[in-house]
């Protein structure tokens, strides 16, 4: 494998805290990874496994030698055990409505074992080890009712209470006598990043967030989009050919000629949650604006260069028809009403097919009873077949879908992955991936999936699908044989693939921690999963 375009600091997301070991030889870096909300009119969370990480680094080495991905909530504080290779990780946050959710983890970085001293605990703001090896933590009250009976009590958001771990105690008792005001100021993440870079001997950490999309421009050139630019162009040896900056950030790369980048415009100061869309074309090495659309869109492209844009109608001010069909010149636009669209229910993402495709509910203003539809060049909508058998159960409602076009000896078809809806909380994730013929919806093969799909590509007789729990699936496109289904690691550290692009027997992958790697498809076929998954390095 040829891995390249790594951030200078590897294996980290957005840094939220930096904690140096008292001996000065190790640093723990707490970071957060983004959910798959890209572009803003597409969202998928099902089965997502990696949100927060504590990575350990040695001086002078920008790659982590160990990482803990067990945290389910933001990491607020860390403490090193005085004698053992163990770290106490305190985390939590306000749930936005009433509760202060928290967790406390003791992680052994040598063995990888994690222990939660408390089954239930409110948000842990600070923690430290006592001399006897127990953990002392300062936590928020359980909820906002803390100060309801006492007008003189400080607000729950300003209060910390002291608890200590003890054998057999699953839920700590909060003693009001230990209450103290939280006078700490929020940590300066930028300052922490600068101190970390200095400690590692790096001019800059080079973090850029997730790689949202990839595309091959030719056999020797790869394009990528992430939060720090509109588009990057790389040579296959990893050399940066060009970085295209401008208003906003790149979200999707549409495989047309010329290449089109769907970008998200900068936030409007008057409406900070507004995310309008812009289209840029790459011509003669320059990225130029060709179109702006009011609202949150997703776009897909046909083989002949037509684009279909679907606008999220979650905004009550934009419930009217906002879908748009663009010809190959991107100059002529036809306004369409394909029915209701929301970010969890109607994204499909099929590119490079002779036709354009969309999902439509039954009736069209619904998110239920979804059908795959062909959108013709004149704007006519042809309903093809239901995504799932309409048996009246909640599981027949498909969500968080992703698709790809395929045309081989079996004929034209589509591969679609998605999630079976469940109306109850806490059920195990149930997902699917199948191949169906385009004409009649005949199912060729099907597999259960562990999480929602982030990306799917078809190449060299293979279907390659990446999932939000970090799994990569290789499926024989014709027979449906499952050749590989394994979690992915790079250099021993777990990751999640958000972007895939294949060309000339090579697969480019983009990760949620900002890395891009190349692997030969022939090599990928031969990999066998170990207990820790497959390592692309």
Specify the residue positions occupied by each region the protein language model found.
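A short beta-strand motif characteristic of beta-propeller blades
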Residues: 2-9, 63-68, 113-118, 198-205, ...
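Repeated scaffold domains used in trafficking and secretory/extracellular systems
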Residues: 13-19, 72-79, 120-128, 209-213, ...
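Hydrophobic beta-strand positions that form the internal "hydrophobic ladder"
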Residues: 27, 87, 135-136, 222, ...
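Residue-level signature of beta-propeller blades and closely related beta-rich strand-turn architectures
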Residues: 32-34, 92-94, 141-142, 228, ...
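Short, solvent-exposed loop/turn segments at conserved positions within beta-propeller repeat blades
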Residues: 36-51, 95-102, 145-157, 269-275, ...
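Short loop/turn segments that connect beta-strands within beta-propeller blades
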Residues: 58-61, 108-112, 165-166, 235-239, ...
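Blade-level signature of beta-propeller repeat domains, shared across WD40, Kelch, NHL, RCC1
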Residues: 149-166, 494-537
């Amino acid at each position: 494998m040829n891995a390249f375009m790594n951030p200078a600091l590897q294996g980290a997301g957005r840094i939220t805290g930096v904690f140096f070991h008292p001996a000065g030889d190790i640093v723990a870096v707490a970071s957060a990874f983004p959910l798959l909300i890209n572009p803003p009119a597409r969202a998928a969370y099902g089965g997502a496994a990696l949100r927060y990480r504590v990575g350990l680094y040695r001086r002078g080495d920008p790659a982590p030698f160990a990482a803990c991905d067990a945290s389910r909530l933001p990491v607020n504080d860390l403490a090193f055990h005085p004698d053992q290779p163990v770290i106490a990780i305190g985390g939590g946050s306000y749930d936005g409505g009433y509760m202060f959710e928290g967790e406390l983890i003791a992680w052994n970085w040598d063995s990888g074992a994690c222990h939660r001293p408390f089954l239930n605990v409110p948000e842990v703001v600070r923690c430290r080890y006592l001399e006897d090896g127990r953990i002392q933590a300062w936590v928020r009250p359980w909820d906002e009712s803390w100060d309801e009976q006492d007008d003189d009590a400080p607000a729950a958001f300003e209060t910390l209470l002291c608890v200590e771990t003890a054998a057999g105690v699953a839920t700590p008792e909060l003693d009001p006598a230990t209450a103290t005001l939280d006078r700490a100021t929020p940590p300066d993440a930028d300052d922490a990043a600068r101190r970390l870079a200095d400690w590692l001997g790096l001019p800059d950490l080079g973090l850029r967030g997730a790689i949202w999309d990839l595309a091959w421009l030719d056999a020797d050139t790869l394009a990528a989009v992430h939060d720090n630019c509109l588009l990057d162009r790389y040579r296959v040896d990893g050399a940066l050919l060009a970085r295209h900056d401008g208003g906003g950030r790149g979200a999707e790369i549409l495989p047309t000629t010329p290449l089109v980048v769907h970008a998200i415009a900068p936030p409007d100061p008057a409406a900070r949650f507004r995310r309008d869309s812009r289209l840029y074309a790459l011509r003669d090495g320059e990225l130029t604006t060709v179109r702006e659309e009011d609202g949150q869109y997703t776009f897909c492209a046909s083989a002949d260069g037509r684009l279909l844009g679907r606008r999220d109608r979650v905004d009550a001010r934009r419930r009217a028809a906002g879908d748009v069909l663009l010809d190959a010149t991107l100059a002529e636009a036809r306004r369409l009403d394909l029915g209701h669209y929301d970010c969890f229910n109607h994204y499909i993402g099929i590119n490079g097919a002779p036709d354009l495709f969309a999902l439509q509910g039954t009736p069209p203003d619904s998110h239920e009873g979804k059908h795959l539809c062909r959108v013709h060049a004149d704007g006519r909508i042809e309903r093809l077949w239901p995504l799932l058998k309409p048996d009246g159960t909640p599981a027949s409602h498909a969500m968080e879908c992703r698709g790809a076009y395929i045309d081989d000896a079996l004929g034209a078809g589509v591969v679609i992955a998605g999630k079976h809806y469940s109306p109850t909380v806490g059920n195990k994730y149930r997902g699917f991936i199948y191949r169906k013929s385009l004409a009649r919806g005949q199912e060729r093969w099907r597999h259960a999936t562990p999480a929602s799909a982030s990306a799917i590509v078809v190449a060299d007789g293979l279907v390659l699908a990446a999932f939000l729990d970090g799994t990569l699936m290789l499926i024989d496109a014709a027979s449906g044989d499952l050749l590989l289904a394994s979690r992915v690691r790079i250099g021993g550290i777990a990751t999640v693939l958000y972007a895939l692009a294949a060309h000339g027997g090579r697969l480019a992958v983009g990760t949620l921690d900002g890395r891009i790697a190349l692997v030969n498809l022939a090599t990928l076929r031969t990999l066998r999963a170990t207990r820790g998954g497959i390592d692309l390095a």
